[in-house]
């Protein structure tokens, strides 16, 4: 059994709706274990660094502003096929295209305020996890 880890961020819009517990319940029911978590207010520098890959995209500044507009819940999830399993739970980036019952279909307002972030590959997951968590902060379960 090969375990993967993925980074998940519950974004300010979903935090403001008080649905962290609902989302965590979905993770756990899908077999994703939470092995690290932080509730925090991102600084502009943290948000810009995390989304640096999008720096030249027209939505970059709006994305950064949104991500610093309120607290976020950041977690590392672990399971077999964690990246794909988490992305399936999230649904399409645009909640209008997300399948019913997915996190974005149920909790997101728009493509900009889409409730959650999930790593898009195992390679990016490793980079994203390391951006927010030291190895000593991840607890094996």
From Swiss-Prot:
Single GO MF annotation: metal ion binding
Xref: PROSITE patterns: NDPK (PS00469), NDPK_LIKE (PS51374)
Annotated Gene Ontology cellular component terms: cytoplasm
InterPro entries cross-referenced by the UniProt entry: NDK-like_dom, NDK-like_dom_sf, Nucleoside_diP_kinase, Nucleoside_diP_kinase_AS
Entry cofactors: Mg(2+)
The keyword Chloroplast belongs to this UniProt entry's keyword annotation: no
UniProt-annotated binding residues for ATP: 11, 59, 87, 93, 104, 114
GO process annotations (BP): CTP biosynthetic process; GTP biosynthetic process; UTP biosynthetic process
Pfam entry (one): NDK
Keywords: ATP-binding, Cytoplasm, Kinase, Magnesium, Metal-binding, Nucleotide metabolism, Nucleotide-binding, Phosphoprotein, Transferase
Principal localisation: cytoplasm
Similarity comment: Belongs to the NDK family.
Summary of the function given for this chain in its UniProt record: Major role in the synthesis of nucleoside triphosphates other than ATP. The ATP gamma phosphate is transferred to the NDP beta phosphate via a ping-pong mechanism, using a phosphorylated active-site intermediate.
Name the UniProt record assigns to this protein: Nucleoside diphosphate kinase
Source organism per UniProt: Xylella fastidiosa (strain Temecula1 / ATCC 700964)
Recorded name of the encoding gene: ndk
């Amino acid at each position: 059994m090969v375990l993967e880890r993925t980074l998940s961020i519950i974004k300010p819009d979903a935090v403001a709706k008080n649905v962290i517990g609902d989302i965590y319940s979905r993770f756990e029911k899908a077999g994703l274990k939470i092995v690290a978590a932080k509730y925090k207010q991102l600084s502009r520098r943290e948000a810009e660094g995390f989304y640096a890959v999008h720096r030249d995209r027209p939505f970059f500044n709006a994305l950064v502003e949104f991500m610093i507009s309120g607290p976020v819940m950041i977690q590392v999830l672990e399971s077999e096929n964690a990246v794909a399993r988490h992305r399936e739970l999230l649904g399409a980036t645009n909640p209008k295209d997300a399948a019913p019952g997915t996190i974005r279909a149920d909790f997101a307002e728009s493509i900009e305020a889409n409730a959650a972030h999930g790593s898009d590959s195992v390679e990016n997951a490793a980079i994203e996890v390391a951006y927010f968590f030291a190895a000593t902060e991840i607890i094996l379960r």
